[in-house]
Structure formats: C-alpha cells, structure tokens
Amino acid sequence: MSPMGQREKAALRQCIQARAQLDEAIADIIKAEVQLKSNSREVKSQLHSCISRHLEILRSREVWLLEQIDLVEQLKGETLHQQLQQLHSLKGQFDLLIHQLEYSGSNSLTTQLTDCLEKLSSLNLTPEETPEMSFQADAHTLRKAITSFGTIASEQMETSESFARPWLLQDCPVFFKKQKLDPERTTPLTEWLLGNHPVCSAPVKYHFSTNPHDWLLVSKESQEEKQLPAFDFQKAWGQLHDLESWLLKEKLPIRKRTCSSSSTFSIEMIDESDFNLDDVEDEQEKASDTFEKEELNKWLVNSSLVKPNQTNPDAERFKQIFKPFYESFSSSDWLSKSDCGSCCATRTTAVEIENLGKLKCLKTPPPSTPVTTPDPMEMWLHKTIPLESTCKANETCTSYAQCVCEDNCGKEALSAWLLKKEGRDKNGVPVNKNSTSKASSHQQEQQQKVQAILEAWLHPSNSAKSPDLTSLSAWAIPHIKLADPENSVENPLQAENWLHPAIKQISSATEMPNKAESKSAKDQDGKDNVEEDKWLLRKRVSAQERLGLPIVCDLFSCMKLGGDKEKWLHQAATQI
C-alpha cells in the first residue's frame, strides 16, 4: 500500500474518532439539559412544600394565639360580670331601703341598713380584673429568620446518611440530642471550667443558636471515629476566675531559692531542675511540715520596689512563665465570622413583611436582562403579514409572541395565509370551481400511483422481467455490467454467478452435451421475441416515468435469480 493511501486512512480514522467524541459530548450535554429541567422542577416542588408547611405552622400559631386571646377575654369578662352582678344586687337593696325610708319613715329598717352597709364594706368597688391586654412578639428576629431562610445550591453535594432522613427531623437542634451523651468523655475541659463561654441552649424567648454545627446532623461513622478533643492549657487556664477556691491545694516541695543580684527586690529563681517530676514526689514528704509554716509574703513579688526605668531579665522571665494567668482573650477570635447573608441585617430602616421582596443583598450584583433572539418563524410571519393589519388589541402589540388577545393574532394570520394559498376563504370554502376539479384530478392521480406501487410490491411477477437499473441498483450490484435493453431480455441472469461451486460443476456437466443442439433453437426463438421484448421494455419505462415507482422496487426487481430454487435456497437440517 502506498504511503498516500495510509495517510488517507489515518486521516479518515482521526475524523471518525473526532466525530464519535463530538456525538458523545452532544449526547451528554442534552442529557444534562434534561436532568437540569427535571431537577429544577423537583427543587421547586420541595421549596413549595417546605414553605407551605412552615406557613401552616405559622398559621396554626396565629390560631392558637387568637384562641388564647378569646380565653383571656372570657375569664376576665366572667370575673367582671360576677362583680357587676353583686354590685347591682346591693344597689337594688339600697334603692328599696331609700324608698321605704322616704315614704314610711319607720325605724324598723335599721337592721336591714346595717346589713347592707356591711355588705358594701366587704365588696371591692374597683374592677377585680384590668382591661389591659397586649401582644408582644420579636418581629425583628422573625423577619431576619424569614429573609435568611433557605439557600439554592448549584453544586453537587456529598451524600451522607443524614440527607437520607426526612427533612422534618432537622427541625430540632442536634445540641439537645448531644446532651444525652456522657459529658466526661465528649465534653472538653474548657466547657465545664468556670468562665465565659458561648451558650448553645435555647433561652426562654426561643432564640435558637446561630451556630450551624448545632443544627446539622452528623453521620454515625464520624462520631465513632471521633477522638477526644484536644486540650489547650493556655485557653483553659486563661479562663480561670475562682477555681482555687474549690480545688484541693497541692502540697509543693521546698525549692532552694537564690536571690537575683541584678534586682533590688527578692524573687524566686526557677531552675530547670524544678520541672523534674521524678524528684518532686521524694521531696514532698520531707518538706510538707515546713512549707505550711512559711509566710506568703516571702515569695510573692513586691512590685512597688521595682524602679520603672530599670529592665530586669528575671522579671521578664517571670512574666513569660505566668503569662497564661494574666493573658486576656478576645471573643472575636473564636466567634464565627459573618457571611453574606448577614449583610442584609445591617439596615437601619424597618421593612414591613409585605415589602420583603424588595430586600436585596448589598454584595449581590444587579441581574442583567437576558438578550432574547426572535424566533425565525415569527420573523417570517412579520415580513409576510404585517402585525398592524392583523392585531385586534386596543394598542398594537410589539410582536406576535406577546399578543394580549384571547386568540393569538399570529395563529389566525397564519391559518388565513395557508387557506389563501389553497384557494379557500377564511371559513375553508373553495373560492373557484376549477380549483376543486384540479384538486380532485390530482387526488385520483395520487391514488393511481399508490395502487400501482402496491401492485408492483404484491405481484412482482407481473412486472417486466429486467428493468433498467437506476443509480441505486448500480451501487448495490456494481460487479454486473448491464447490456443493452435488447440483450438484457435475451440473456437473463446466469446461475453461475449465484450457485455454489459444487453445483456449478453439476450444472455445467449436464448442459455441455445439449449445448450444440439447443443453440440453433435459441437463435430462432430469440429473433421472434426481440420485437415483443422491445415493446415490453418501452411500456415498462413509460410506466415508471409516469407513476414514479420508488427506487427500492427497482432494486428488488434486478435481484431475481435464475436456475432451480431448490439447489440454492437454504433448507433446515434434517434430523437422523
């Protein structure tokens, strides 16, 4: 093979591989688009379900509060009604006494008067229940929770066991579940030592924790593999306040002291041998009695004796050793930083709940309006049928796609144009009678063509014996060279081109003796049939040109075989 042919084959192979890669990439992109649409529908349904459930909870809370208002009103009303009934009863008694005293003037009513006065003194003349009633709610916290509720993630998230659970299980903070664990093994020392540390439990007003780790579920594998928390001495001892008041005092051994020669005050020199833990236990028993008798002011630093301008290396070393006891810490070092969602909370002006849609994050850029390309069908319709001539609205629409009419003007204009092309009016009635006759003749001709095609397929023996090969036939059988139409009838397809080699020998052996005898007879018969075959071929070609038979019929007609069919047809194997 020449190098030029090898190069062509290599280039062809590369082109085929590139086309296959492009087909695969196109299929992946189409699949991603379909998945994107389905995922967006699913996320919308999840969002709608979540918001609806929480709205139901909020509505239930509203109904419960309304019932509480009715209950308080009923209780206070009953109390005031009872008090009012007692006062009205006593007032009636006084009215009766006044009437009797004015008209009778008897002194026998003194006992009744004293009884009424005693009742009056025992009754409370002020309302027993106050009419005050108010509604108190932390609207700022609720508004902040609503505006920062929910996020849309566009990246693939790692699947874990916690995501397989229902989302309703995540409504309660995980912090309350963690409290059931053993605090001695899971809680670090910095959380139970005295000191200021962030509180994660919910207060009375339902101010839940803002720490996301208190709300997110943790998988079981991470809990089992979790080791004990690391202990930082500086953080633990830096938060000491009154720990020495309840911790047991440790008995320390006596250490030999050396006075500093460069300082004017007494200071304890701490050597490296003092940190030897092996010698500490031996010295504890010997120096236990003498250590308790020492005065506290002998080893404490007296800062008043130090001159301000002098720098003492021993004092610097002392400060470095006791630095954890005096070092202060800042809460901003361990508090979580604010994210983008909290920048909306820095507003000074109050926003009502109806205007929550106007809230925008300060860091979010304004959305850019997408550029929409007009549909080519709509552009063609604009050119063919102007919008001003068909639009039925009070104000002409900008395009057919944005038509505000009940029936789209574009559809009506397109249907009217199609009916006009067919020679019909807007109701579908033909305008001219000549067009109906032409249409009926055209339909009859089409029916005749279909009938001829069916006849050629169902009864191939009735068609011409050897039709002319078209381009499709020449491509399907390139090794057969066609002769003239006249010779094609005389010389049909030879069986030698189709039969098995063994069958060829048998057929050739049987035909050789009779070859000379049959030659003269064939010449005579051929001359008689030439004229008839020519007429049949012309008839066949004219029928094909008139009816326009498909090329597939021509392909199957040229594949007719001669010879005995029993010799070359496939037969099933006989069982012995």
Curated annotation (Swiss-Prot):
Tissue expression per record: Expressed in the intermediate cell mass (ICM) at 24 hpf (hours post-fertilization). At 48 and 72 hpf, expressed in circulating erythrocytes visible in the yolk sac, heart, and liver.
Protein keywords: Chromosome, Cytoplasmic vesicle, Lysosome, Nucleus, Receptor
Gene Ontology MF terms in the entry: transcription coactivator activity
Superkingdom to which the source organism belongs: Eukaryota
Subcellular location: Nucleus; Chromosome; Cytoplasmic vesicle, Autophagosome; Autolysosome
Chain positions covered by the region annotation Disordered: 425-447, 510-529
Disulfides per UniProt: none
Skewed-composition ranges (Basic and acidic residues): 514-529
Full protein name: Nuclear receptor coactivator 4
Protein's organism: Danio rerio (Zebrafish)
Lineage of source species: Eukaryota, Metazoa, Chordata, Craniata, Vertebrata
